[in-house]
Amino acid sequence: TGLIAPDKKTVDYIKRSDGQVPKNWMEFCIDTPNSDATVFEFDASSLSPQIAAPHSPENSENAEEFSNTVFDIAYIGACTGAKYVDLAAAASVLKGRRIASTVSLKVAPASLQDEKKALNDGTLKILQDAGAEFLPNSCGICAGYGKDRLTEGQVCLSSTARNFQGRMGASSSRVYLASPYTLSLIHI
């Protein structure tokens, strides 16, 4: 298990988003790791774009390793991969461009708040102009629910956090994971 202690920046974000901050939040902070803690430090900016192959997030490789993979669906969605910052990252790639005609781009903003912000600043318009189909804010495809769930044999590149077999629909579907930015770059 990996745990990341909340810091002041995290709590400030929660306060700004009308979230409830537990009164005892400081108990979860660590000034110095205790003897049982293992701390890993790395520079994320040194990583090349990554894609995780089915059926585990652990199956991560450099994105270029998947250049011959054909995707049916590009999905920017879920609470983990469709926050405002994610939608804006995808829009920064797709502005003035269209998604490949062979791919269906589906977007389900993480929350109504994220959707409203993206609507107000034109981010959703950029995604729409690029060919996005918008879905409701919900677990939907991510949890394999509803009419948009993956069908037999479909291949999806998704900004969700999990790609276990059958997670997003049919057990024969294959889900690859990528950031919204990487997902957008691959499909233009």
Predicted regions and their residues:
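Conserved small/polar residues in nucleotide/adenosyl-binding loops
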Residues: I186-I188
